Amino acid sequence: MSYLVPAEFVTKMVDAGESKVFMSTRDTLIRSFMAGAILALAAVFAIAITVQTGNPLIGAILFPVGFVMLYLMGFDLLTGVFMLVPLALLDKRPGVTMGGLLRNWGLVFVGNFAGALTVALMMAFVYTYGF
């Protein structure tokens, strides 16, 4: 990994925000759905470890693994999109509008929520029927 001076780092962040605005609806929903599902699974994993061991510190140490997985796989969590997309708007990138920003936020919210809800329903099914 090469070193970036702060100005180059900010430029990369603005570029990432711009690319998220122009991403297709399908790709945005898939990336955000997977992010919600992976983070929900990380929460389930942390809670299960905490309950099984009786030590909440172990669960707290293991929960960030979900965030690392999101970063490495390049998925979109709403909190990250809240930071990156407005940077492209503030930089006045061509084609980046308030409508595009709100569209992206809405799609990522729906995808994150759907992914987390899917995992919640799967966990409810598993624990209800004892699989």
Where are these regions (language model features)?
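Alpha-helical transmembrane segments and their helix-helix packing motifs
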Residues: 1-131
